[in-house]
């Protein structure tokens, strides 16, 4: 089973991780890639560099960042492979132990 994990940190946007945090996360990523559970992962740049595109009927609207709602800010994503939703949840808990406070939404990918 594949899952898309979307991470929304509680920290204010643009708060950089410490060198130690980066090292611990780097080790977690390396081990997770080797095990085959982590397929891809990347962090996102600040929302000021992004945009939201919406379609309603035949009209499109574009709103440039930054976005003010902190609960809507995406810090990064991961694509993981696990044997079950329960295993994906446990993997995500391990990630959050390192990343810190925040929320990760997991969505199973249609295969």
Task: For the regions a language model picked out, list residue spans one by one.
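Conserved, structured core segments of small domains
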Residues: 1-111
